[in-house]
Amino acid sequence: MTTDFLFPKIADCSYVSCYCEENVWKLCEQVKRTRPEELSKCYAVFVSNEGRTVPLWRQKAGRGDDQVVIWDYHVFFMHNPLPNRCLVFDLDTTLPFPTYFHKYVTETFRSDLALRPEHHRFFRVIPADTYLIEFSSDRRHMRRPDGSWIKPPPSYPPILSNTNLHCLGDFICMSAGKGPGAVYSLSEFVQNFYKSPHVGVQQNK
């Protein structure tokens, strides 16, 4: 894969296990700081559904040869500089970092056709600049009833917006018309962000 990557190495990225929404926020922040001209081509993508049971393959936390795991939600970063050059940066995948959109979707989500309806995946796609402004989390979802942490939090302070203390649920929600960005089914997501390099090529006769 040859391209001018926004993030040269995965080791250059802020990462804390089980805080994917914050990891992606940090990627957006890094682009704004180092490559601001590319920010308008970047997105934060939440994956979930009504029951918050979404199977993903090729995940570091997955089991078996296929490395499949069922998350309540997941978040990854996309850079879409050209119609057929969309790249996915997922800090939790076992695929390369980054991976071209088509390969990532094919190996990570496969198809909804073989899944029960309650496991179908939906995608909330949020422009990176919107995500930087509107995302806010006090990390309450990672605390047990006694106040202890389910997983250790990042060492930096919580990411809080000026208007909301905790709005993570609005991003995980897959109801159209609610929350920032746009919500797609798996097929709609592919139709919107995958453009075959052969589409639109005219041949001389």
Swiss-Prot record:
Assigned GO CC terms: cytosol; nucleus
Enzyme class: hydrolase
Pfam families with a match to the protein in the record: Nt_Gln_amidase
Entry's EC annotation: 3.5.1.122
Entry annotated with the keyword Hydrolase: yes
Highest taxon, organism lineage: Eukaryota
Family to which this protein belongs: Belongs to the NTAQ1 family.
Subunit description: Monomer.
Record protein name field: Protein N-terminal glutamine amidohydrolase
Protein source organism: Drosophila virilis (Fruit fly)
